[in-house]
């Protein structure tokens, strides 16, 4: 009998817990430890930012679904890992022991590495978290009411570029539906060596396909960029 703990219950952690429960022996146990009792479907964050979805549409209360699956659930943040003891110390003073540990805590966003970057004290919006996406929605609504230039993209150090392109085309579509696209010049900025690189040296003809779509939709782009700082306006 083995006890497997999954630390984190986001897109990776929740799926991993389900997969483990399906594939491990009946006598093995799985426990999820997470600071957030609610699951957010991160791929839908771009839709939140333009009002195509609401928070309730993409969130799930984890406790009942984990219980139904026979997975232990501890909605308390971890404070410290003690690998020599096979133990996780929690912020409430308690701890969870394990035989095997899966760390799925997600990325640590590095907005502080670029002055002015990020939604917390900076001048850019984000769709990395549902809270960010909701804040971006209010900014998008202001844009519709008072159209002006928009820059969308990714900064150096990003490892996943697909969402930036997705958000670019979602915003373009939402602006057209709002009948203000003609008053919103759009520019895509990326550290990729070419459009459609995606951090993967391209996938098929992503370069040609994406460049074609961006030309058709009158979206300018800048590649091989490094963002030094972001200023208001």
Please place each PLM-identified region on the residue numbering:
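Glycine-rich phosphate/pyrophosphate-binding loop and the adjoining helix
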Residues: 197-202, 212-217
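Charged, low-complexity cytosolic intrinsically disordered regulatory segments
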Residues: 57-64, 210-215, 222
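Catalytic donor nucleotide-activated moiety binding site of glycosyltransferases and closely related
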Residues: 200-204, 226-227
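Phosphate-coordination loops involved in phosphoryl transfer and adenosine-cofactor binding
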Residues: 1-3, 146-147, 183, 224
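Beta1-alpha1 glycine-rich phosphate/pyrophosphate-binding loop at the start
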Residues: 2-72, 156-200
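Internal, well-ordered alpha-helical segments in soluble enzyme and binding-protein domains
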Residues: 132-136, 167, 206, 210, ...
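A conserved beta-strand/loop element that lines the FAD pocket in flavoprotein oxidoreductases
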Residues: 67-82, 215-230
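FAD-binding core/adjacent interface of flavoenzyme oxidoreductases
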Residues: 71-166, 173-179
């Amino acid at each position: 009998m083995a006890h497997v703990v999954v630390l984190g219950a986001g897109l990776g952690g929740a799926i991993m817990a389900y997969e483990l429960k399906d594939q491990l022996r009946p006598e093995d146990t799985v426990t999820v430890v997470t600071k957030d009792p609610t699951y957010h479907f991160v791929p839908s964050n771009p839709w939140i930012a333009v009002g195509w979805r609401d928070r309730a549409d993409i969130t799930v209360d984890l406790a009942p679904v984990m219980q139904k699956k026979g997975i232990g659930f501890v909605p308390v943040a971890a404070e410290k890992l003690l690998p020599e003891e096979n133990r996780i110390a929690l912020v409430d003073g308690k701890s969870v022991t394990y035989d095997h540990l899966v760390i799925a805590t997600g990325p640590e966003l590095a907005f502080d590495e670029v002055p002015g970057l990020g939604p917390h004290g900076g001048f850019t919006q984000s769709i990395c978290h549902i809270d960010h996406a909701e804040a971006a929605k209010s900014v998008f609504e202001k844009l519709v009411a008072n159209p002006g230039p928009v820059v969308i993209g990714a900064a150096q150090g990003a490892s996943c570029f697909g969402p930036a392109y997705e958000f670019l085309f979602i915003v373009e579509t939402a602006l057209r539906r709002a009948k203000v696209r003609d008053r919103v010049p759009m520019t895509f900025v990326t550290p990729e060596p070419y459009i459609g690189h995606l951090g993967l040296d391209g996938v098929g003809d992503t370069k040609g396909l994406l460049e074609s779509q961006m030309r058709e939709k009158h979206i300018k782009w800048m590649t091989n960029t490094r963002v030094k700082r972001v200023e208001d306006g």
